[in-house]
């Protein structure tokens, strides 16, 4: 992937960048692997806003991704690399030798014509999926399960990966992208390699309208609201916060306050917390 830089033909174009989509080989998705996707605009079933700053945006169809990779000992050929509007990573279309089709996250370095497979005896090759206990120490992996058979949940965004540090019986130690080291059940599966489209984070959106296309609405600062809307609101002119510490819109302390439950069951599986955590 390369970054495409636009000429400053307008204020909106100035500094705008995007992907050149050079890796994309197929423009229309596989119809049998699509599902409808309705928009909620951040509302729940009561119509109450549960996630702010969401609404509008371009219509999308959901691409059904195989995060489980449980079709063992059946080889599949990569026939296309496609764009997926629902995630930062690209996706790869597989054609299995038994005739079935599936989408997977497109790993870095995987090209059209490559072959992949999954299973306990799969080779240590980019795109292959196998249990953590069968993956050598130091190997880069992505799409990692937290529960056997549930499907990959960790390291699925563009450019992300984790590193296998070693197998210790029932558990395998893995270093995540954040620097956190945690134990994961050795029966859980992971896919070899890092997720592709690694330059996605370098894209400059460039203008507000492009954010609206993605369903993101404007965000107002609390200090410009009324006091009944935000703890920072009110006052004459540019007033200070007026409290010992910045607050969330719901009156809780923000910036630096720990939000993770210290009694969470998975806390005992974390060997070292992520970088920057106090």
From Swiss-Prot:
| Pfam family, any one | Ribosomal_L2
* Gene Ontology MF, one: rRNA binding
Q: Where is the composition biased (Basic residues)?
A: 209-219
Q: Is this entry keyworded Ribosomal protein?
A: yes
Question: Biased-composition ranges for Basic and acidic residues?
Answer: 258-270
Q: What superkingdom heads the lineage?
A: Bacteria
Q: Does the keyword Electron transport apply?
A: no
Instruction: Please give an example of a GO cellular component term from this record.
Output: large ribosomal subunit
Q: Which UniProt keywords apply?
A: Ribonucleoprotein, Ribosomal protein, RNA-binding, rRNA-binding
Matching PROSITE patterns: RIBOSOMAL_L2 (PS00467)
The cross-references to InterPro entries, in alphabetical order and at most eight, read: NA-bd_OB-fold, Rib_uL2_dom2, Ribosomal_uL2, Ribosomal_uL2_bac/org-type, Ribosomal_uL2_C, Ribosomal_uL2_CS, Ribosomal_uL2_dom3, Ribosomal_uL2_RNA-bd_dom
- Which HAMAP family does the record associate with it? Ribosomal_uL2_B
The Swiss-Prot or TrEMBL record describes its family as follows: Belongs to the universal ribosomal protein uL2 family.
Function, please? One of the primary rRNA binding proteins. Required for association of the 30S and 50S subunits to form the 70S ribosome, for tRNA binding and peptide bond formation. It has been suggested to have peptidyltransferase activity; this is somewhat controversial. Makes several contacts with the 16S rRNA in the 70S ribosome.
- Provide the assembly information: Part of the 50S ribosomal subunit. Forms a bridge to the 30S subunit in the 70S ribosome.
NCBIfam families per the UniProt record, alphabetical: rplB_bact
Its protein name is Large ribosomal subunit protein uL2
Q: Native species of this protein? A: Lactobacillus delbrueckii subsp. bulgaricus (strain ATCC 11842 / DSM 20081 / BCRC 10696 / JCM 1002 / NBRC 13953 / NCIMB 11778 / NCTC 12712 / WDCM 00102 / Lb 14)
Gene name, Swiss-Prot/TrEMBL: rplB
């Amino acid at each position: 992937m390369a970054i495409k830089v636009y000429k400053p033909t307008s204020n909106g174009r100035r500094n705008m960048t995007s992907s050149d989509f050079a890796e994309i080989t197929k423009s229309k998705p596989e119809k049998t692997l699509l599902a409808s996707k309705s928009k909620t605009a951040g509302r729940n079933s009561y119509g109450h806003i549960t996630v702010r700053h969401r609404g509008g945006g371009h219509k999308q169809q959901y691409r059904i991704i195989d995060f489980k990779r449980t079709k063992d000992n059946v080889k599949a050929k990569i026939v296309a690399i496609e764009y997926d509007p629902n995630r930062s990573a690209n996706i790869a279309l597989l054609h299995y030798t038994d005739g079935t089709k599936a989408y997977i996250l497109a790993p870095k370095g995987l090209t059209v014509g490559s072959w992949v497979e999954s299973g306990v005896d799969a080779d240590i090759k980019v795109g292959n999926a196998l249990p953590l206990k069968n993956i050598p120490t130091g190997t880069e992996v992505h799409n990692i399960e937290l529960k056997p058979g549930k499907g990959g949940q960790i390291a699925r965004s563009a450019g992300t990966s984790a590193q296998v540090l070693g197998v210790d019986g029932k558990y395998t130690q893995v270093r995540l992208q954040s620097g956190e080291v945690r134990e994961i059940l050795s029966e859980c599966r992971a896919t070899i390699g890092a997720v592709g489209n690694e330059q996605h984070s370098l894209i400059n959106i460039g203008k507000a309208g492009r954010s609206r296309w993605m369903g993101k609405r404007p965000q107002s600062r609390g200090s410009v609201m009324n006091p009944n809307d935000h703890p920072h609101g009110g006052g004459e002119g540019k007033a200070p916060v007026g409290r010992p510490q910045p607050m969330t819109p719901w009156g809780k302390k923000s910036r630096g306050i720990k939000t993770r439950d210290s009694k969470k069951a998975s806390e005992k599986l974390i060997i070292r917390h992520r970088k920057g955590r106090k």
